[in-house]
Amino acid sequence: MTWAIVMLILMSLVKIVLTCLPTGVIEWLLGKFEVHAKLSDENASLSLDGKRLEGAEKQKVIDQFNEAIFLEKYYIYPGDEERYLHPENGGTPLVIDTKKGKKDVKLFVYRYDDHIDVVKQYKKKVIAYRVLSESLQKESLSVAGSLA
């Protein structure tokens, strides 16, 4: 009988702790599994066709990327990574080099008329997903205009 009461108290404590986690802990946990992470100006370097973007143009592209809406994640079959890293009709990608924690992450951004494909490469993993950003798709900047 006492074991049942002790177990009930322990289960109640675990339930309370898990359902009342501080906001910082929740944000950290969600950040660990976030596919479309936000970029910061300090950690990101952007290049298009080998030319680095700097200043207001860089900040504008980063803001547009951060405001993009995540649509879906693509499943990449083993051995099929090159098809996503260098698509046939993808054009010239916008390459974003950044850090996520201690890991170096490289993002390839391919612009299409109705969506944007992002291919994230870190260590030996490749993750591809689709986002929607009308400002990044339709922008007449020299950068965004030459992504296609």
UniProtKB/Swiss-Prot annotation:
The chain crosses the membrane at residues 7-29. Pfam families: YfmQ. GO terms for cellular component: membrane. It is found in: Membrane. Its main location: membrane. It is a single-pass membrane protein. Keywords: Membrane, Transmembrane, Transmembrane helix. This is Uncharacterized protein YfmQ. It comes from Bacillus subtilis (strain 168). The lineage of its organism: Bacteria, Bacillati, Bacillota, Bacilli, Bacillales.
